Amino acid sequence: MFGFHKPKMYRSIEGCCICRAKSSSSRFTDSKRYEKDFQSCFGLHETRSGDICNACVLLVKRWKKLPAGSKKNWNHVVDARAGPSLKTTLKPKKVKTLSGNRIKSNQISKLQKEFRRHNSDAHSTTSSASPAQSPCYSNQSDDGSDTEMASGSNRTPVFSFLDLTYWKRQKICCGIIYKGRFGEVLIDTHLFKPCCSNKKAAAEKPEEQGPEPLPISTQEW
């Protein structure tokens, strides 16, 4: 088997005066022999001189073989290899995007991890709370919950990873919840306990009684 042979490359410091290529597999030559045909062959409006690559020399020779009266030229090769083309420069990079379902699952798993981490911190905080701070609030009024905007609160929220411009912190009779703009609810099991009043009402609710039995007469006839 023959080994791979790397072709020899020829280089020019100033580059080809037509296409501006600075390297070629063929030698560069002086452009004096072809300068008189540059205007018609390449559609140039200025005089160019210097080195010329073999590819541009072949284009000049091909132009000379065109039939008389032909207006064909190779203006598109002028300065074509001066640098990266505009198309290459402005071409946006392809970014691998995940599907919507995969992104959503990743966000959910990340949220669950944050919940676990913050729940462990919240549990150690709530376990040492005084009885007055228990989840059963007996002194609250009947007109609902004490709603606080999380962005306006001075204390640091337990869930520091939440978007405070979207979630509202609400203190209800069963504890503390975070409510979203569209009705979503986030609950921390360490800060949310069943309401004492609901338990008491369920215990005091009389059991449903069936129909009273008809009295049995004991009189002898």
UniProtKB/Swiss-Prot annotation:
GO biological process, alphabetically ordered: negative regulation of cell differentiation; negative regulation of cell migration; positive regulation of cell population proliferation
A cellular-component GO term for this protein: Sin3-type complex
Region (Disordered): 112-152, 201-221
Skewed-composition ranges (Polar residues): 136-152
Signal peptide range: none
KW Acyltransferase (keyword) present: no
Top-level taxon in the UniProt lineage: Eukaryota
Keyword Nucleus: yes
Compositional bias ranges of the Low complexity kind: 124-135
InterPro entries found in the cross-reference section: FAM60A
Compartments (UniProt record): Nucleus
UniProt entry keywords in alphabetical sequence: Nucleus
Main location: nucleus
Compositionally biased spans, kind Basic and acidic residues: 112-121
Family indicated by similarity: Belongs to the SINHCAF family.
Record note on quaternary structure: Component of the Sin3/HDAC corepressor complex at least composed of BRMS1, BRMS1L, ING2, SAP30, SAP30L, HDAC1. Found in a complex composed of at least SINHCAF, SIN3A, HDAC1, SAP30, RBBP4, OGT and TET1. Interacts with SIN3A and OGT.
Function: Subunit of the Sin3 deacetylase complex (Sin3/HDAC), this subunit is important for the repression of genes encoding components of the TGF-beta signaling pathway. Core component of a SIN3A complex (composed of at least SINHCAF, SIN3A, HDAC1, SAP30, RBBP4, OGT and TET1) present in embryonic stem (ES) cells. Promotes the stability of SIN3A and its presence on chromatin and is crucial for maintaining the potential of ES cells to proliferate rapidly, while ensuring a short G1-phase of the cell cycle, thereby preventing premature lineage priming.
Protein name (Swiss-Prot/TrEMBL): SIN3-HDAC complex-associated factor
Species annotation: Pongo abelii (Sumatran orangutan)
